[in-house]
Structure formats: structure tokens, C-alpha cells
Amino acid sequence: MNTYLLFHLYGPMTAWGDTAVGEFRPSHEHPTRSAALGLVAAAMGIRRHEEDRLQALERSCRVAVRLDAPGEVLRDYHTTQVPPEQRKVRHYTRRDELQASKLHTILSQRDYRTDAAATIALSAKDDPPISLQQIADSLTRPRLPIYLGRKSCPLALPLNPRLIDANDLKKAFDQYPTSMETLRKLTESLPRYGSGVPASDHIRYYWEDRESSPGMKPQMTYPRRDQLRNRKRWQFDTRNEHYFAQIRED
């Protein structure tokens, strides 16, 4: 019997950063390992410069995701005025940039997911510096603001952290309601609006090595660069992520 910590992630907009090159800032369909643990770090009051505490959290948990609803892509376009690059000229503030005699315009775009819902499952590694109970307590009373990838993406449901004992990861997920089920119960008094979350035909699962389950055999395995190496330098290592899709029964 293993212990898992499960909690909801749902909001009108989410953004789970993918590899970004140039002006394009894409989003993964589901929360990444670094995003999930970054959210936990905020709940525990761990600041970005506290490298030792971040590494302790990294060594403590394995992360799995159940994608309850993938949502839809929303692409946001930006135009920004910037000064031309000049040697020996440094702009320390945005005000300094705008005072330049000549300004150029750059275009950028950022992807979001609207009405996406996911369930995170954490399991403890061997001899974890931080326990699942400590994380659950922090998710119940977060010390820093929690957002879903970007500061413009607040939560729309309580995290609802819950420790579950189960034989394997799939059984732990089965014991925890989907975000849509929770939202449906909250909106029963407003039948006109319903749950508001468009569901797909499949429930999708993503997990790390050593977390296979009899009812959840990998259909795909691919590398994912989202395992923290050094937060100050924004360096991440590669890990293997497994994928399994199940036809939705509800």
C-alpha cells in the first residue's frame, strides 16, 4: 500500500510553459513537473532564490497528472516598443527604454489553455526531506499566492488536497473525483450554467518512472525537460514521461 497526495488544478486560464524560442511562448497541454512543484513551493512559502529548499522539494516527490479536461488554446498577441541595441548603453528600467530617441516594435505571442482541468498526484521518493503531510498542510493554507503557470491565471477551485492510500497510482486517481465532478457539485444550484468545463472523450494520464500500474500501461514514453537542476540559472534536466489514455465513462 502506497500513500499519494492528490489535488485539483482548475482555472479559467492556465499556461504550462513549453520550450520557448524567440517571440513564441507555447503552453503544454498538461501541467509539467516543474510547474506542479513550483506551485507546491509557493504554497510552502519557498522563494525562487532559496535553492536549497527548492532542491529538497525536488528530491522529495514524484509527480503524476490526470488531465480531466484539456481545454482550448487561446493565443494572445503582444506588441512592445523597445529601443535598438547599442553597445555600452544599458537600460535599467522600462522608463529608461521608452526615453530612447528611437523605438522599434516587436511582436510576440503567448498561448494559454482555457477551461482546462487537471488532478496532480504526488508520491514520496525514498527518504524524502519533505513529507507529503507537510505539503498537504501547505496546500490547505498556502503562504504565497498560487497561480496556474502565469500570474494572470488564478485558481477557480480550491486545491482540495487529500492523502489517499492505494495499491497503485491508478487506484489512487480512481478514488479522487475529477475537477468536473467537483465543479458540478458546486454549481448544482445554478443548473443554467452547468459545470462550464468542456470534457474530452478520454481521460489522459502522465507519470514518471517507477509508477506503473496494472490498469495503466504506457501507450507512449517520451523525454521531458522539466526536472529542476538549478533554479537560479533556469537549468532543467531531462526525464522520461509515460502517457496513457482511457475512454471516459461518465
Model-predicted segments: where are they?
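Charged, low-complexity intrinsically disordered regulatory segments in eukaryotic signaling
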Residues: M1-F7
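Short polar catalytic/cofactor-binding loops
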Residues: L9-A15
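Glycine/small-residue-rich interface belts in oligomeric ring/scaffold proteins
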Residues: T3, D18-K88
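Internal, well-folded beta-alpha domain core
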Residues: L67-D250
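Short beta-strand element of the conserved SAM-dependent methyltransferase core
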Residues: F7-L9, L122
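Generic preference for well-ordered secondary structure
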Residues: T14, A20-F24, H49, D96, ...
